[in-house]
Amino acid sequence: RLTLIERGKIPSKDELERVMIARHTPNVHNKLKAGKVAVLGLGGLGSNIAISLSRVGVGEIILVDYDVVEPSNLNRQQYFVKHIGMKKTDALKSIIDEINPFVKIKTKDIFVTKENIDFLKECDIVIEAFDDPKNKATLCNTVLRNFEDKYLIASSGMAGYYDSNIIQTKKIRDKFYICGDFEHEAKEG
């Protein structure tokens, strides 16, 4: 079915949905729209991932971070000057609402621990985008132990200024993937 969008006019939800179905094919679009993804850590990696998920049409995204936007974040994270001092969860939600207002966004302004991650029960995919190696390990071990039905995508060695050509994705085991350069340790970006 052909859908024409009037130039200069914001398309309706139905019009935008038809455009996305045509772009992805109905089967892929329906899978994306039904997806529920939690992004834990909304810094340089997590903020970019969340925005990409919203652009492709993932149906529900849970944004999780405890931090606020600082001036030092602006060179590598998806925030603007107007967001300085805001919770990263609220700032990123406002950005995603402008990109794709039809994505359901939930926010959790928390420091994630193994005691407070029951909310992950409601999602299909967990994306770990933390800076701290200890927090990465704790989250991954807890998810792998307590949420065996979830896909877990973790990061390793993604901070700093290194050769992006060496970044790869490895399947560690069923439903567990790590993306990174596998050479540099985790650290703040």
Question: Which stretches of residues belong to each language-model region?
Answer:
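E1/E1-like adenylate-forming module used to activate ubiquitin-like modifiers
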Residues: 1, 5-6, 125-189
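N-terminal charged helix/coil linker that caps or initiates catalytic domains
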Residues: 1-37
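Hydrophobic Val/Ile/Leu positions in short beta-strands of Rossmann-like dinucleotide-binding domains
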Residues: 39-42, 63
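Hydrophobic/small residue at the entry helix of a nucleotide-binding pocket
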Residues: 45
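Conserved S-adenosyl-L-methionine
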Residues: 55-60
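Glycine-rich phosphate-binding loop and adjoining beta1-alpha1-beta2 segment
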Residues: 65-99
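A structured beta-alpha segment of the ubiquitous adenosine-cofactor-binding alpha/beta core
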Residues: 89-95, 99-123, 130-133
